Amino acid sequence: MATIHVDGKEYEVNGADNLLEACLSLGLDIPYFCWHPALGSVGACRQCAVKQYQNAEDTRGRLVMSCMTPASDGTFISIDDEEAKQFRESVVEWLMTNHPHDCPVCEEGGNCHLQDMTVMTGHSFRRYRFTKRTHRNQDLGPFISHEMNRCIACYRCVRYYKDYADGTDLGVYGAHDNVYFGRPEDGTLESEFSGNLVEICPTGVFTDKTHSERYNRKWDMQFAPSICQQCSIGCNISPGERYGELRRIENRYNGTVNHYFLCDRGRFGYGYVNLKDRPRQPVQRRGDDFITLNAEQAMQGAADILRQSKKVIGIGSPRASVESNFALRELVGEENFYTGIAHGEQERLQLALKVLREGGIYTPALREIESYDAVLVLGEDVTQTGARVALAVRQAVKGKAREMAAAQKVADWQIAAILNIGQRAKHPLFVTNVDDTRLDDIAAWTYRAPVEDQARLGFAIAHALDNSAPAVDGIEPELQSKIDVIVQALAGAKKPLIISGTNTGSAEVIQAAANVAKALKGRGADVGITMIARSVNSMGLGIMGGGSLEEALTELETGRADAVVVLENDLHRHASATRVNAALAKAPLVMVVDHQRTAIMENAHLVLSAASFAESDGTVINNEGRAQRFFQVYDPAYYDSQTVMLESWRWLHSLHSTLLSREVDWTQLDHVIDAVVAKIPELAGIKDAAPDATFRIRGQKLAREPHRYSGRTAMRANISVHEPRQPQDIDTMFTFSMEGNNQPTAHRSQVPFAWAPGWNSPQAWNKFQDEVGGKLRFGDPGVRLFETSENSLDYFTSVPARFQPQDGKWRIAPYYHLFGSDELSQRAPVFQSRMPQPYIKLNPADAAKLGVNAGTRVSFSYDGNMVTLPVEISEGLTAGQVGLPMGMSGIAPVLAGAHLEDLKEAQQ
């Protein structure tokens, strides 16, 4: 710690910080542009000037840039010194000489750091009367709009994109006061994390193009704390709504999880919530048509049918909340509850859970991954299946340069010096996969092989680290030399990290990862293990347990069950569509509860219109076992009284109560959570994931809307001049109103949107943190359900045999895509242009045998249908395998590991 003196007052601060960080952490306001907590200091903008004095007697002082000055013990500075204030105002005026005066039409208006800093410095009058330099804007793809004339040359964008996210297609061109930030030519930004430019940029150069089409000012949107639903990582988000539509998603700061950044799937993949074809009312089949029901009719009709059924089974979902899956389990009984995922996937999920719960290896939170100094990724294409983890791995690899700089006593915020000292030095990263991955550019070595051979590599590494681990026979000398390099790197690391997951299609790969981690722990290393699952609540569903989807289908096929309730699950993604359709056709009652129109609704007798994550409350559990709560952003019925969309748990409990002819006793979310905790002790922690509905701050609920929210009385005037009462939230501590507490200093961790007096942009998160870039002042939201076990598992011993290609037979290797493989985000219209066209990948040798080239269309039969796809050639894919894009164009993820036998060139 260090003692500094600011404008005559004494403060205790972190001596490792610079003065800007220290003052912002104290709650003092210093304007800045080029500095960012995640990017460090470069002193490019000169906006953060303060007056520094030699001692208490010095009255003259000198101007220094606070972001480039350490917060040393005994420092004396003044923020309010007149010369410093005039200098800061002059800097803004210089920046404004070329900045357009277009705030009223700029999409950043009201959410703009430049506006905030201009007001903070007191600059309010323009004296420049000459020609402004102008630029041509670029088309940067479907996600981001580009308006270069607003640029103030702070260099944040290229520092984030190139130095932090390792992007290669955005740069700075020109010199002096005529520099251009963009691509060499028009085109879509290639980085999976390009959307963060929207919040990194302090002006309106980079803005959210998906928001542009249905634009609202930040102060006119309703927000709620939420969790990204597009993968298993559980990033925190702030969805914004207006007129019953999601308009944008912003990053919600969580110092333990995603801190300042999201991936593009999480930021832009919300379009499925706004689709017009979503089920909005319950419907029941009458012959070939569906008739619309109200809620009471739906419940009574369903109950009447279920009473006549001899056995009702329930099929849950990894994309439904803990509460909804539990409500289904209560409706049908624990013995009749099925997870809705394939047997193989469920087996891998349970194995991953076993490793996390009983393996005795620490599971780091997302942000902690950045602190590891050697990483082994076994089998998982992390950028496509858990992209935010990939960004964290990139920071872990860069830790080598920080170590080198620290050895020379260079502060952590001196980023230019760190990059200069490091000269691209990296901590070791080793990646195995069936083919190339997006992490290969920073990897020390990559191994492209079938999953069996990847598992064998992992087992061999574990044995080399600890000879009591099972040995692997038949390792080639060349591969053994690589294993020796990996072993040396992992054994020499202080904090090695092993990453694997369930998307590999191989339980043996997960076992190999666990063995490596156990062997490293036995050597005294502070080892961590990260498992990536498939869906937002896969871990929660795994903890809850239940039979596999195949078992559920067998119940229907044999007639043992004659009614089925399917919860938020497109079963065609988890099993053969032919088998699913045949099994559902045998059931006299098929009830579907979902917020998306899926293929299985064609077999449904009753459809209950569920609410999406934006219209409901619930709990999900991420890949590290962290329970996190998402909150309802808006009530769709407020805009359309004909809409009947309820949380799935509310539908199912209401049906259960109707079936038993009793009163509904789960009238709010807390009641469901209490029931979950009572029945499933391992989920007891979900009660602490967020405060209950009685939580108040000074007697007030928390506001979902900024206090400047406008137009509420006129929003429905086109429907009726009579303004209805605002929706009443009985489930949570939030209110659908601007009336309520929204103070940044209030004792809360669940923050709907970032705002503080004088801070309207995302930089306002500074005001909510215990120290800038640290944790939220009153703790990061969420709670870990299981900590590191004191015990450890025995070594897994089932070393697989080496993969052997078979003539006339090809094994399907899974290829995942950030844009396209996820069930929900692939429905977003804006994603269509980013999704690759369906393909089949072949090794050159296999392509030669078949007599096909790149672009040739080949066909194969699957599930009774003939599939025709264009060929792509890949040198990395091992012969005897074909690669298919999982989750796209009818290519169900369950296909991973299956075999094709009739692959041939398609008839023209």
Curated annotation (Swiss-Prot):
Positions bound to [4Fe-4S] cluster 1: H99, C103, C106, C112
The protein's Enzyme Commission number: 7.1.1.-
PROSITE patterns listed in its UniProt record: 2FE2S_FER_2, 4FE4S_HC3, 4FE4S_MOW_BIS_MGD, COMPLEX1_75K_1, COMPLEX1_75K_2, COMPLEX1_75K_3
Keywords: 2Fe-2S, 4Fe-4S, Iron, Iron-sulfur, Metal-binding, NAD, Quinone, Translocase, Ubiquinone
Function: NDH-1 shuttles electrons from NADH, via FMN and iron-sulfur (Fe-S) centers, to quinones in the respiratory chain. The immediate electron acceptor for the enzyme in this species is believed to be ubiquinone. Couples the redox reaction to proton translocation (for every two electrons transferred, four hydrogen ions are translocated across the cytoplasmic membrane), and thus conserves the redox energy in a proton gradient.
Family: Belongs to the complex I 75 kDa subunit family.
Protein name from the UniProt record: NADH-quinone oxidoreductase subunit G
Species, as recorded: Escherichia coli O6:H1 (strain CFT073 / ATCC 700928 / UPEC)
